[in-house]
């Protein structure tokens, strides 16, 4: 998506990375290879490893279906923090319902209260570095800052294998196993 937006459409981009400390070295190298080759600045928020491990463990202990919610919330919040900090009005979101699927409405919770309630019940370490998505902040970013999400993969033809081949050829991208 970075390649397409920068090379084909000529957009000025700011890459955003929520580092939950679970990245492989190869995945991190891929991020830097792409941003360096495309001359794109990178904004990274690194959460404390022990804190994030405790948060994920609390989701596992709770038995909820959506154990990836903390990572999703962390990324969404980090994107908004970066957009606000640098005055960016449009976030290009790489979510694709084709490759990531969708969930029934009753399974989807995307707010700080949910994260906090699961963590309060099952976690042990206070959350200090995790960028939680509080409703008032979400409303501020949407209504006052007027930050909008654009999801090109909802409209573009996307083939994961073709994308991997292009990334490997053009940027030295390596398969990281994820």
Label every model-predicted segment.
Residues 4-178:
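Nucleotide-activated chemistry modules centered on ATP-dependent adenylation/adenylyltransferase
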């Amino acid at each position: 998506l970075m390649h397409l937006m920068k090379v084909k459409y000529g957009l000025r981009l700011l890459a955003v990375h929520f580092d939950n400390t679970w990245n492989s070295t190869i995945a991190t190298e891929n991020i830097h290879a792409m941003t360096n080759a495309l001359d794109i600045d990178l904004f990274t928020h690194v959460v404390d490893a022990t804190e994030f491990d405790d948060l994920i463990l609390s989701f596992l202990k709770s038995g909820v279906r959506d154990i990836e919610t903390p990572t999703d919330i962390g990324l969404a919040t980090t994107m908004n923090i970066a957009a606000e900090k640098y005055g960016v009005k449009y976030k290009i979101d790489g979510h694709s319902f084709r490759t990531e699927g969708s969930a029934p409405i009753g399974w989807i919770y995307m707010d700080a209260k949910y994260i906090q309630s699961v963590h309060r019940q099952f976690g042990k370490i206070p959350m200090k570095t995790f960028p939680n998505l509080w409703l008032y902040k979400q409303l501020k970013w949407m209504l006052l800052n007027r930050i909008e999400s654009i999801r090109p993969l909802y409209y573009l033809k996307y083939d994961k294998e073709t994308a991997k081949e292009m990334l490997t050829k053009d940027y030295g991208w390596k398969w990281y196993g994820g």
